[in-house]
Amino acid sequence: SFVDISKMKPLKIVVNAGNGCANICFENLKKYLPFHFTEQYMKPNATFPHGVPNPMLEECRRPLINQVLLDGADMGVAWDGDFDRCFFIDHKGNFVEGYYMVALLSRYFLNRYKGETIIHDPRVYWCVQKVCKELGGISVESKGGHAFMKETMRKVGGIYGAENSAHHFFRDFSYCDSGMIPWLIVAQIISETNESLYELVSDLEKEFPCSGEINLPASHVDRVMQAVEKEYAKDAKEIQHIDGLGMDFGEWRFNLRASNTEPLIRFNMETRGDKLLLEEKKKAIMEFIKNQN
């Protein structure tokens, strides 16, 4: 079992399915749970009257954030249309980047299962690697995408793997991803620690500030990425091509990946505790890519 319901407190949780499919599973779960729910857009509706069910988009999160603040809820949870991903709002109305949720869940598993292996994607990962090192776990990098993540998890026997896009994979769930297991684990962590979600991730956010995923238009994606690598290679301590282009400069690093469906470059960046450096380098790289177009 991933959680112990007997240890859970009667948290106030706002849930939003975006009129997707999550309610089918949620209805079967909630009768066993001690939480007080406020429900938004839970009825499946293929016309999506409240907009596309994509909580990665800021405008899709606004109703959930407003309700969390109105209710004084402990957290908000939103699912995408097929509910294989879930997204979190803390009690202050802040969206919690998937990166920090991966680190939080990694900490949960490593506290319970010593020496286990955690799989992460190449976008941003310093935070996850630190958690693994502190708790005696092993971190393994995998190319993003469910097929690659599952293959890597099976190969190394990873107990948990995740992409920063909010796909969470579990060995004891047949190595599949789930949008229901993560929020139940987070609810248990809050219940056990008496810490808010905000408190649980604030140290991670400060130590490893990240850009979040930024989509940048690029008419010739491969050419642009080659130009970026050439421009920054002389200062890089490490260059990776596990999934797109990853460049590490010691105190900051970034990853560029080509979209599979659109003429876009997906840009992620992180630093070691330096928000000013994050903004400076982010702006410079985005401007460089813009000029290549």
Model-found features: residue ranges?
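Phosphate-binding chemistry for phosphorylated carbohydrates and sugar-nucleotides
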Residues: 1-194, 206
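Phosphate-binding and adjacent anionic-ligand microenvironments
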Residues: 113-293
